């Protein structure tokens, strides 16, 4: 009786019915072992179907259906054809090597291979060395980058400081230019003040025709242009004050006479041995040139002080020459003497004498200003 068992195709898993009558009789252990091998092959990691088929002695050892058998056979034929092509290729290359390198021997190739191997080892050592150097360079590069970042940060701070300092410099330069402009302006004004005769500003002396003036007060008297004694007294007070300032300016003092400026009641004081001996009034009342004014002694003493001042100025500057010479109680113009006292004098000549006296005072002012030390 024929025994049949149910199996499945190892490839497509379709059920198969195998006739085991054609199988080689084995022991039960052998049959059990064969089934175990098939099961392990089917459930194993590789499931090497070709190996099972190749190792099978009977169809029942590796059951495969006809379709899968044909497919496997065709695949094996394709692999065999591929292997044949590879064999031909290798054979062709072997023939090429034999033809083109007939003298190449195995020892030479081994030696060459050894050299290549040694060179490879040397290159590997060089590569390790280069890798170590590269690692060190990476460390150095990181260090330098950190240093560069710190330097860049410091450079940024320094740039900010430079910017702030530069802005401060520009502001200081602007302020310096402003101060320099102010200094130049002050220097110009100072030069103007230095070149300005303060006495000329404070005591404006002007001679218009015959009648002379000082600070707007007329010092003269004409019948066709009468001047009150109040104005003449004010003018005399101005010239006494000016004479006092000029004597103080050059640092001299008459040994006996001293001008005392008291406005419209000025006078000349006579001192001997430190004692006030007498005063000479330079103010009058009534009608000028009437003979009763009483200012002639004061005018004489004033002319003495003026002559003393002009002499001191000439001693300090030999080139200085007063416009008009003083002789006793007169002033000389082109050899003509003009008496400065009112008694027995005409209005024109006395007025002319006062104008000449004012001109000498104006010249004394200019000379005192020229003698002062530069500031």
Swiss-Prot record:
It holds the Pfam family APG6. It comes from the Eukaryota. Disruption phenotype: Embryonic lethal with few surviving larvae which fail to carry out the L3/L4 molt and few surviving adults which are sterile. At the L3 larval stage, accumulates vacuoles in intestine, hypodermis, pharynx and coelomocytes. Abnormal accumulation of mig-14, lmp-1, and rab-7 on these vacuoles. Mislocalization of several components of the retromer complex, including rme-8, snx-1 and vps-35. Impaired fluid phase endocytosis in coelomocytes. Double knockout with either sorf-1 or sorf-2 results in smaller endosomes and an irregular distribution pattern of PtdIns3P in the cytoplasm. Expressed in PVM touch receptor neurons, the ventral nerve cord and in the nerve ring. One of its GO terms (biological process) is programmed cell death. PANTHER family: BECLIN 1, BECLIN-1. Interacts with ced-9. Interacts with vps-34. Interacts with sorf-1 and sorf-2. Belongs to the beclin family. Regulates autophagy. Together with phosphatidyl-3-phosphate kinase vps-34, acts as a core subunit of the PI3K complex that mediates formation of phosphatidylinositol 3-phosphate (PtdIns3P), thereby regulating membrane trafficking. In association with sorf-1 and sorf-2, negatively regulates phosphatidylinositol 3-phosphate in early endosomes to allow for the conversion to late endosomes. Involved in the clearance of engulfed apoptotic cell corpses. Together with ced-9, negatively regulates somatic and germline apoptosis. Plays a role in endosome-to-Golgi retrograde transport of mig-14. This is Beclin homolog. It comes from Caenorhabditis elegans. The gene is bec-1.
